[in-house]
């Protein structure tokens, strides 16, 4: 099995240590006038993609080690190590992936002569380096890694793995009282995120730090009259934050400044974040609000600060003292328009209840013309312990880089603020948690090991996938990557969508097929990315998504063919989306006008259907490890030099009482299937089983028929629908029906944009 994979794929971790190079020595007669050396650095590329860079050193001594994740075709992969100064290329050394894999020694070590651009060897210029390749199949699985306590977290991250943390997992902003997923006959405590956020902010005594993509100060967090905190009903975020600041709490708000947003001409910007509204609201108050652009050396307006965190102090639980500790929330939710929703994800039945009608995926939509609204499904997490302090540190590093650090609180001067890192008696503080980021030195101080870029979110995804033994469950707003394996040669070259997550999943499935072991992957994404489906950006993102799906199914189909199995690619990999369809009821909101006939808006309203927008960013592996945060599965989020992101990767060290990761997955499945999949179903506790795969797929296919049919039939709370593609036995992806999403003229397979460069849409 492993040898077959190695013949095709350079798949594993390439560790390269750059030691030093021949010292600077100008040739005669320039040695009399050019006595000062220039700072030199080394870059490492896989094919045309730069994957590592050393610091610049005058003495040409670096002693820097890089772990480079690889999942590339063997025949087309070359590693290029280049010695440079700021103004010139001094020389290169190239080695093919095939040479590394067929080397007699596991280690390639030595002083290597460098080659000039004209192909001549520079005998007096050598670079000392060491290369060592570890195939991915040698990675221990999660079960063994945790039993042996060998998993110590992601190496190239700013923050280490922290023990003795408390983690609470959330789905959706709020839940109805009737939402009751159960695990082993015990109700899963599905918490109400926005109520918990309100209570946490209200109880803060020293600091409330918020980093966001957007924030609406007029947003109401608590709206349910049956809440435990009735005094909070109707209170806006802005009112709450101003009140806390007047009590002496340091409230600091750091929002992304969309530089395409120009309030003087009433242009809301490409992303329509309306952050100027927050800035104006907090002006002349004790709340310090700052707008920070995502600075970038090439395209200053193209990328975003996409982190979503709330960090504050909270009372130490189960303590009779007045000690306080740090708590942090992070994930997919911003405190802004359209995010409030429940597990019901209604289209038409809640239009008259709140003043935040949100529908950005239908051109011309507004409340006066009626629904459907855009339902919102998202996931979030709160953490207490050492990892919460790391989220605080991330905020401080970003604020220090772009704002005035003097307005930050000196936490070491707060006497009763403690960091409880040691073992405790609390059963719920049995989590190991690591904070992961996508960020660079332009946006944060104190980068890990002096590296200019951190992409530990990407590395965390890859590490978790490589350790997977049974199944993977993903919910994400986007799913694209691994362009080196795409079918279109032009897309491979121009897209730059090189993150390895999709191909890692496909190679994991292929390896399991060759080993004749069960394995299953479930991926839930939106029907289309947010925005009118006929827009060029949406259509191009759909195109990249189709390339990614096709590549994965092709790899799986080839593995099935190689072993002569009679299984189908969809016995291993399935894509789903969420959707709703509602029959009309008495008492619904009545629009004062109607959409133009034959438009997408008119069709969706007449057919009473629309997608549930999946904004989650989470991955669950083997019910053992969960990665959750703000990062999408695309190049913008995984690159490190594009959007800034934050996430946590975590697992329980003791699951004797409850496996909370499994309970969370089952709660999500309970929501998506309207209670059809519960913890009582044997197959749901064995997600890798063919029974479970076919059970979920059957639900998805049946609900797609109801959703896409001509007759308006209520989906009765079952939102899981099969993504509208057909897959052949050999892994070819084909169209379903007319190839368009219902009510639209938009092709499911998308198409390339003639206007936007791929760097914006990948």
Curated annotation (Swiss-Prot):
* Enzyme Commission identifier(s): 3.1.4.4
Which tissues show it?
Answer: Expressed in roots, leaves, stems, siliques,flowers and inflorescences.
Q: Which Pfam families match?
A: PLD_C, PLDc
**PLD phosphodiesterase domain boundaries:** 301-339, 610-637
The answer to whether UniProt assigns keyword Acyltransferase to this entry is no
The lineage's top-level taxon is Eukaryota
Q: Name one GO molecular function term.
A: phospholipase D activity
Provide one Gene Ontology biological process annotation: cellular response to phosphate starvation
From the record, what ranges are coiled-coil?
none
Reaction equation(s) it catalyzes: a 1,2-diacyl-sn-glycero-3-phosphocholine + H2O = a 1,2-diacyl-sn-glycero-3-phosphate + choline + H(+)
UniProt keyword annotation of Secreted present? no
Indicate which residues the UniProt annotation says bind Ca(2+). 172, 345, 377, 671
Main enzyme class: hydrolase
Q: Where is the C2 domain?
A: 1-116
**Where is a 1,2-diacyl-sn-glycero-3-phosphate annotated to bind?**
306, 477, 615
Q: Which InterPro entries match?
A: C2_dom, C2_domain_sf, PLipase_D/transphosphatidylase, PLipase_D_C, PLipase_D_fam, PLipase_D_pln
Q: Which UniProt keywords apply?
A: Calcium, Cell membrane, Hydrolase, Lipid degradation, Lipid metabolism, Membrane, Metal-binding, Repeat
Quote the subcellular location field of this record.
Answer: Cell membrane
The active site lies at 306, 308, 313, 615, 617, 622
Q: Which cofactor does it need?
A: Ca(2+)
Q: Name one GO cellular component term.
A: plasma membrane
User: What is this protein for, i.e. what is its function?
Assistant: Hydrolyzes glycerol-phospholipids at the terminal phosphodiesteric bond to generate phosphatidic acids (PA). Promotes growth and plays a role in nitrogen signaling.
Q: Which family does it belong to?
A: Belongs to the phospholipase D family. C2-PLD subfamily.
What this protein is called in its record is Phospholipase D alpha 4
**Lineage of the native species?**
Eukaryota, Viridiplantae, Streptophyta, Embryophyta, Tracheophyta
């Amino acid at each position: 099995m492993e040898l077959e994979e190695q013949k095709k794929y350079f798949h594993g971790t390439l560790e390269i240590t750059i030691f030093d190079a021949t010292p600077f020595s100008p040739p005669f007669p320039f040695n009399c006038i050019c006595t000062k050396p220039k700072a030199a650095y080394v870059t490492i590329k896989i094919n045309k993609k730069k994957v590592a860079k050393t610091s610049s050193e005058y003495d040409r001594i670096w002693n820097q080690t890089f772990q480079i994740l690889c999942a590339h075709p063997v025949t087309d992969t070359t590693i290029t190590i280049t010695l440079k100064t700021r103004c010139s290329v001094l020389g290169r050394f190239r080695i093919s992936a095939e040479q590394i894999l067929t080397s007699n020694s596991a280690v390639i070590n030595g002083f290597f002569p460098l080659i000039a651009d004209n192909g001549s060897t520079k005998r007096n210029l050598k670079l000392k380096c060491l290369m060592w390749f570890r195939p991915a199949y040698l990675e221990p699985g999660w079960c063994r890694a945790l039993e042996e306590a060998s998993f110590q977290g992601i190496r190239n991250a700013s923050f280490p793995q922290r023990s003795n943390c408390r983690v609470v997992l959330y789905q959706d902003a709020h839940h109805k009282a009737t939402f009751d997923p159960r695990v082993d006959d015990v109700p899963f405590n599905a918490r109400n995120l926005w109520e918990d956020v309100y209570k946490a902010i209200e109880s803060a005594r020293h600091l409330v730090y918020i980093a966001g993509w957007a924030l609406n100060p007029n947003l109401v967090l608590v709206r349910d009259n049956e809440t435990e905190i009735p005094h909070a009903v109707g209170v806006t975020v802005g009112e709450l934050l101003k009140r806390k600041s007047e009590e002496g709490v340091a409230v600091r708000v750091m929002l992304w400044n969309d530089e395409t947003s120009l309030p003087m001409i009433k242009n809301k910007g490409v992303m329509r974040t309306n952050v100027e509204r927050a800035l104006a609201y907090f002006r002349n108050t004790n709340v310090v609000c700052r707008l920070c652009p995502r600075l970038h050396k090439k395209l200053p307006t193209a990328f975003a600060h996409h982190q979503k965190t709330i960090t504050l102090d909270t009372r130490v639980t189960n303590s009779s003292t007045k000690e306080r500790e740090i708590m942090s929330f992070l994930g997919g939710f911003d405190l802004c328009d359209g995010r409030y929703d429940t597990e019901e994800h209604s289209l038409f039945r809640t239009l008259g209840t709140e003043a935040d009608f949100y529908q950005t995926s239908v051109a011309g939509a507004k409340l006066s013309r009626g629904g459907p609204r855009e339902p919102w499904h998202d996931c979030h997490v709160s953490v207490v312990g050492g990892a919460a302090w790391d989220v605080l540190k991330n905020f401080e590093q970003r604020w220090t880089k772009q704002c005035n650090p003097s307005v930050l609180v000196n936490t070491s001067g707060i006497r009763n603020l403690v960091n409880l890192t040691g073992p405790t008696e609390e059963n719920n503080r049995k989590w190991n948690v690591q904070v992961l980021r996508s960020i660079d030195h332009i946006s944060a101080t104190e980068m890990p090991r002096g590296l200019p870029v951190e992409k530990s979110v990407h590395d965390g995804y890859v590490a978790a996938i490589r350790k997977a033994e049974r199944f993977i469950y993903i919910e994400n707003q986007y799913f694209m990557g691994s362009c080196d394996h795409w079918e279109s040669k032009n897309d491979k070259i121009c897209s730059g969508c090189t993150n390895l997550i999709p191909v890692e999943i496909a190679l994991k499935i292929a390896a399991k097929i060759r080993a004749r072991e069960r394995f299953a992957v479930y991926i839930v994404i939106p029907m289309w990315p947010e925005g009118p489906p006929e827009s060029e950006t949406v259509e191009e993102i759909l195109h990249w998504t189709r390339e990614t799906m096709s590549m994965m199914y092709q790899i799986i189909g080839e593995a099935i063919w190689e072993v002569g199995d009679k299984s189908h690619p969809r016995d291993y990999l399935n894509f789903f989306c969420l959707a709703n369809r509602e029959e009309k009821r008495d008492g619904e909101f009545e629009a004062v006008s109607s959409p133009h006939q034959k438009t997408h808006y008119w069709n969706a309203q007449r057919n009473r259907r629309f997608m549930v927008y999946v904004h989650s960013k989470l991955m669950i592996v083997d019910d053992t490890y969960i990665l959750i945060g703000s990062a999408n599965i695309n190049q913008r989020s995984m690159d490190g030099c594009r959007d800034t992101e934050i996430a946590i990767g975590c697992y329980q060290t003791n699951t004797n009482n409850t496996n909370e990761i499994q309970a969370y997955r089952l709660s999500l499945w309970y929501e998506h299937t309207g209670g059809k999949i519960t913890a009582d179903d044997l197959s749901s506790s064995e997600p890798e089983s063919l029974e479970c795969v076919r059970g979920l797929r059957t639900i998805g296919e049946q609900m797609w028929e109801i959703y896409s049919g001509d007759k308006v039939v209520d989906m009765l709370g079952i939102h899981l629908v099969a993504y509208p593609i057909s897959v052949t036995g050999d892994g070819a992806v084909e169209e379903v029906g007319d190839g368009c999403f219902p009510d639209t003229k938009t092709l499911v397979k998308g198409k390339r944009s003639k206007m936007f460069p791929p760097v914006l849409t990948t």
